[in-house]
Amino acid sequence: MRGPARPSLMERWEALGRPFPHLPRWGAALVLVLALALAVGAAVAIAPSAAGDAPAPRSIASAQSSAPAANARAKGDMALYARVAARVAAGEGYHAAALAEHRASGYPTRPFVTIRLPTLAWLQAAIGTHGVRWLALVLAAGAIAALVWRRLPLASIEERIIAAALLAAGGGAALSRLAGYDHDFIAGVLLSLALFAYRPHRWWPAFLAAAAALAVRELAAPFVLLWLAFALAGRRKGEALALAALLALFVAGLAAHARAVDVLRLPGDLASQGWNALAGYGVPLAGLLELTGLRHLPPLLAAPLAVLPLVGWAGLGGRTGLFALLWFTGLATGMALFARPANYYWVELALPAYAAGLAFAPRAIGELFGRLAARTAKQI
């Protein structure tokens, strides 16, 4: 007879609980040194921006809190998406409208990913831009409900309430009149819902949210790939098959989108500058400072604070904490490698969920110092 099945990698990880109390003294010291290095590095990286070299406002958060920023953006990406949405709502085909508006505005049309996926424009035509904004608010409320009432494992009720307030502050950006046009913001809200709504025996709500994010913004694909890796590590065959099917469907849809763009492209159309800038971690950091409430703080104070949520997620443990840690660090690394400074808004894919990690940071830091103190007391 076969003995009991060995626990999967994910089962062994989740059985560990919160990871920091299990660290040896040197491990706790290493994590604290790394956190301090990240905080100092963030302050150093943002120093040029603090001196006046800040990125041009693009975010809905910027538009919400600054009239000049809103006017600047009205001449850029959001105005372009608004014109495309209006033409689609009037009955014109999406790709014809999008390429025409890109040409008229001096935007590139090659490669095909410079043209946003049509999903959001179709949704705007169906329920209106205001409808999209209200839908984003409902989705943000769903993420908050999943966090508080469904009980995020390993977090106290006090931590969940603070995290919910941070989620509400970020999700409230949907009140901006520009929110309905922002693909990255909508995808970020959907991915936040997918992160918090996941439950091992009821994963389909999170699956639907992730699928919707993927349909809105192709940059959500790494989130789904990471989830697939987690499903495989947890030996969850049905979940893994569903995610693999979703990715296959996404690839087919992306190929159809590329074909539609190629057919309508003209010889004189502009090409993108590319996405191999190797601009470093200052890009996602600049995004966090521009797109969150940290923009109201002095940059040299805000930059180190931008790192704290990562410590909170690392200390949370469980499936949610590990997934969040890998997703956020992976997104930041991808931006550091491929994004141009003007692409700092990609960080919206991590919002508002990333900010919720700030609620978990105090206990995580306390646990690290506790490990150091426990060893010291033992030696005494």
Sequence positions of predicted segments:
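Hydrophobic alpha-helical membrane-interfacial segments at the cytosolic entry of transmembrane helices
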Residues: R235-H257
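Membrane-interface helix-loop-helix junctions at transmembrane boundaries of multi-pass membrane enzymes
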Residues: P153-E158, R236-L241, P309-W327
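TM-lumen/periplasm interface segments of multi-pass membrane proteins
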Residues: P4-R133
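Hydrophobic, aromatic-rich transmembrane alpha-helices
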Residues: A141-L147, P298-G321
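Membrane-interface alpha helices of multi-pass inner-membrane proteins
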Residues: L191-A197, W203-L232, A245-A248
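Transmembrane-helix signature of polytopic, membrane-embedded enzymes
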Residues: V148-G172, V189
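Short acidic/glycine- and proline-prone juxtamembrane loop motifs at membrane-interface regions
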Residues: S176-D184
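Transmembrane-helix motifs of polytopic, lipid-linked glycan transferases
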Residues: W122-A126, H130-E158
